[in-house]
Structure formats: structure tokens, C-alpha cells
Amino acid sequence: MLGTYYYHEILRKTVIAFGTLFNDIHVRHDGSNNKSISDLKVALAYGPMQKFLARIEQQPDLNRATQITLPRMSFEMNNIAYDPTRKSGITQTFKASDGSKLRKVFMPVPYNIGFELNILVKLNDDALQIIEQILPFFQPSFNLTVDLVSVIGEKRDISIVLDNISCLLYTSPSPRDRG
């Protein structure tokens, strides 16, 4: 449409960078003597929460074990909005990573990309443990350096802002609710 084809995977790299923030969260359950009896790594997947709820509730055979374990988290990109307050000049000169020649490239267009992180748990304590492992890092933002355009060695700091938190405590539907 507008000239030469290019694809630097900038949005893909941004989605991956967001997801990697949450891929090592654990939930522990303690016994009566305060010794850890289980340590669960919280599963993380890209996709809407409704997809996971539907998979949990699709049980034609009520004796079969559920395929999805809780707690789990999902995330998805849900908004892309132009941010005119961060706009700068149209072109800028970058030196190639090998230092041999100058390359002229367009400046990135400033967009805010919205993500939704969903936490799905059976136990309220699991939700509290997960949230407590996330909140301290966002005051209210967390900066992450991402290699956005590797052909010119462009690394940018991406500020991830935590706007709000909501959590779903999952209660299994009764057999009569399943139809």
C-alpha cells in the first residue's frame, strides 16, 4: 500500500515482552505446620479469559478430569491507541551495529498498547499470592528494554503501566447449571 514491504515484528515482540513479565509466578500451599506442601507454577497463556472458562466448563463426561488446572493466568492485547504527546521528528539517522555505514530510518510512531492480564483461581489465597508477586514491581509503571528493530540494533525502553486489577474466583458450575 505505502511502498516497500517490511515487518520488524514490533507488536509481536511487545506481546512477548509483556508475557515474559508474568511467566515465573508461583503459588504455595502450606500445611498445618507451616511447611510448604505444594509449589505450583502458575500457567500463563496468550488468549482471552473466556476461552479458558469455556474449556473448563466443556465436560460432556462428568467423570473425566478437567484438562485445565487452576490457578492460571491469561493475557491478550486489547487496545492500540495513538499517543500524540510522544511524537517526535519523522526521520532519524542510526549508525549500523557494525559501524560501517549510516542508515536512515523512520522514527517509531508512538502508540500505547493495552493489555489485559487475567487471573483465574479456585482459592482466594491463590489470587492474593499472585497479585502480591506482581504489585511491588509497578509503581505505577515498570520499564522493560526490548530489541525492537534488530537490523539496526534499536533497543527501546517500554514503560508498562498497571492501570487496575480485577480477579476472577472460579467456582465450578453445579451439574444442574451445565445443562
What function would you assign to each model-found segment?
Residues 1-30, 84-87, 98-154:
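Charged, amphipathic alpha-helical segments and their flanking helix caps
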